[in-house]
Swiss-Prot record:
Native source species: Staphylococcus aureus (strain N315)
InterPro entries from the UniProt entry: ABC_BtuC-like (IPR037294), ABC_transptr_permease_BtuC (IPR000522)
Subcellular location(s) per record: Cell membrane
Highest rank taxon of the organism: Bacteria
Protein name: Probable heme-iron transport system permease protein IsdF
Amino acid sequence: MMIKNKKKLLFLCLLVILIATAYISFVTGTIKLSFNDLFTKFTTGSNEAVDSIIDLRLPRILIALMVGAMLAVSGALLQAALQNPLAEANIIGVSSGALIMRALCMLFIPQLYFYLPLLSFIGGLIPFLIIILLHSKFRFNAVSMILVGVALFVLLNGVLEILTQNPLMKIPQGLTMKIWSDVYILAVSALLGLILTLLLSPKLNLLNLDDIQARSIGFNIDRYRWLTGLLAVFLASATVAIVGQLAFLGIIVPHVVRKLVGGNYRVLIPFSTVIGAWLLLVADLLGRVIQPPLEIPANAILMIVGGPMLIYLICQSQRNRI
């Protein structure tokens, strides 16, 4: 009971930190806002300068929160579905497949803009299915599976590079220049995906069982692995439709959360949601304040942090095999 209460207290503290970071991100920038500016705006209702800043910063902050949460949860789900601690949507090519589909849809059927998360999901499924089919045939270990995923990532990024030579082929570049319609589109996918994940979370712990143990208790492990994998691909692909590829968030957060609160998915999913949202928000905030008025993409900061972590996890995986 004491441990459970400590986890609840930690979760509340993380929520407070997240809200405080969101406020700091909102008032920080080339044009700074004071508390008095916000107070005047919300009491009088008229302040054109504040209104313009709200329309520039608030969509960006909300999208950072949703994308961070979705990618962190997607990483946790992929690791559960594939039973691979190194799995992450960007590394195994899911994000690249989703981005190619997104780019093609915007070129040929731009009128379906509001359906981009769903269309990107179709593109993200292709590399995921290839990984599953190859794994079922060759039974890769954790590192070999990631190497196959990296090969798919390189292949699909090559295709994407060719496609983007067309000046009409536009792909999203991070969190900059986001508008309210982007928030609305992503919010639908975020709510749907995260609610389904919370409903599924009691079953996720059973994915650690082997096939014989699962069948002995009447648990259809293959069905839930597929459901978990598809949900992970959906969450990651929906973010790609709005912000493009963001690396390593799906690796960093689940491993940090496991160190903090253990591997119980009922606890891991909510904590991953909050910490993922906070981490991307911090990366975006740092990118805006390190060298103003220039902006460093949040993805660059995540790669600087995530690259060494991936190397560490690969070394740890190899050590465990010895």
